[in-house]
UniProtKB/Swiss-Prot annotation:
Residues 211-231 are annotated as: Basic motif. Highly expressed in liver and at lower levels in heart, brain, lung, kidney, adipose tissue, and skeletal muscle. Expressed in some immature and in all mature olfactory sensory neurons (at protein level). Pfam families: bZIP_1. GO terms for biological process: cerebellar granule cell precursor proliferation; circadian rhythm; fat cell differentiation; multicellular organism growth; negative regulation of apoptotic process; negative regulation of cell cycle G2/M phase transition; negative regulation of cell population proliferation; negative regulation of DNA-templated transcription. Acetylated at Lys-29 by EP300, the acetylation enhances the interaction with CEBPB, DNA-binding and transactivation activity. Ubiquitinated by CDC34 and UBE2B in order to be degraded by the proteasome. Cisplatin inhibits ubiquitination and proteasome-mediated degradation by inhibiting the interaction with CDC34. Ubiquitination and degradation by the proteasome are inhibited by NLK in a kinase-independent manner. Changing residue 29 to R: Decreases acetylation levels and interaction with CEBPB. Residues 118-154, 168-241 are annotated as: Disordered. This is Cyclic AMP-dependent transcription factor ATF-5. Disruption phenotype: The majority of pups die within 48h after birth even if there is no major phenotypic differences at birth. Mice reveal a lack of milk in their stomach and show a dramatic loss of mature olfactory sensory neurons. Keywords: Acetylation, Activator, Cytoplasm, Cytoskeleton, DNA-binding, Nucleus, Phosphoprotein, Transcription, Transcription regulation, Ubl conjugation. PROSITE patterns: BZIP.
Amino acid sequence: MSLLATLGLELDRALLPASGLGWLVDYGKLPLAPAPLGPYEVLGGALEGGLPGGGEPLAGDGFSDWMTERVDFTALLPLEAPLPPGTLPPPSPAPPDLEAMASLLKKELEQMEDFFLDAPLLPPPSPPPPPPPAAAPSLPLPLPLPTFDLPQPPTLDTLDLLAVYCRSEAGPGDSGLSTLPVPQQPPPLAPLPSPARPAPYPSPASTRGDRKQKKRDQNKSAALRYRQRKRAEGEALEGECQGLEARNRELRERAESVEREIQYVKDLLIEVYKARSQRTRST
């Protein structure tokens, strides 16, 4: 048997009454099935040369001592000692004073009532006016086209009826009156020229011509700017050249004057040398 099975058997014996240990003794005499061996567990019979799972352990072997040893499990019981049967449980805390609580509640209610009575009665705030309805976007209505009422010429039927009425009014005996001449129908009026409707898009020819003209104008303006820039550069170079020429003339004149002075000094030195040599010869 394993250690857990042995401990379980000892606990059952300690907890069960003495009257119920008879069947447990009989149960202990039954042969037990061999328990599965763990990696560090061997049977006592195998150690002593007996068969595993059968036979009684030998007296004085290593298993019989600790298997029959009594274990004290009182250390696992709760630390608090149970109350003896004659003692009473500790008294519960006294309930709060109901009269004191009622008086405090009454005072609070009186203070709240005084506060509400002293507060001025303010009229309820009026609700904010509703926002004005958003104006619907008005679409521009098309303007009515002007109508031209042209005087219509009288028709031939109206003229004929008018002539018959005039004859009947003149009478048959009135021969002095001549018949009214039939008025000539006025020439029909020429239709009014309709306003020229602009083309929905420019023609390709005009667009191409506009592009060429625009390109030509751009080239002209670019050439004009180039000529102006070159003219300004030429004028600046010409002014600088004139300044350098004036400086060159001034330096040339100064160099010529210095050269004349040097030649004059040379001539003086030659004359002095000649005069000194003549003086030495004469002496």
